[in-house]
Amino acid sequence: MSDRIVVRDMEFYAYHGVFEAEREIGQRFEVDVELHLDLRSAAQADDIDQSINYVDVYTAIKEIVEEQEFRLIESLAEAIAEVLLSAYDLEAVVVRVRKPSVPIGGIVGEVEVEITRTPADLRSPANEEL
């Protein structure tokens, strides 16, 4: 069984992208996260210390998006997942990163990457190569 805390539509201005102009000019990025965990004890105790503080989640994501540099939003999503899985006792985390303005030579509303990770993914051999 899995409960969820969902934080949607976080917006940041950052300098990620494949193209040099994206990294120089910057652009808007949007992030959603779903934190899968058992929330029964927090609900029964009505105590934030038994849950996850949304401010802390937002702050951690803001630091990653605004202070680190990535060429791919896939890499940005992975970094967010790793930090959240390391910081909290989660069953899983879903991370969505959207890039509303994509320089691909056509009209596109946005591009989004969605990843799902579990604590086992932190210990996987593929992750050790990153």
Predicted regions and their residues:
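N-terminal, polar/charged subdomain of small-to-medium soluble alpha/beta proteins
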Residues: 1-130
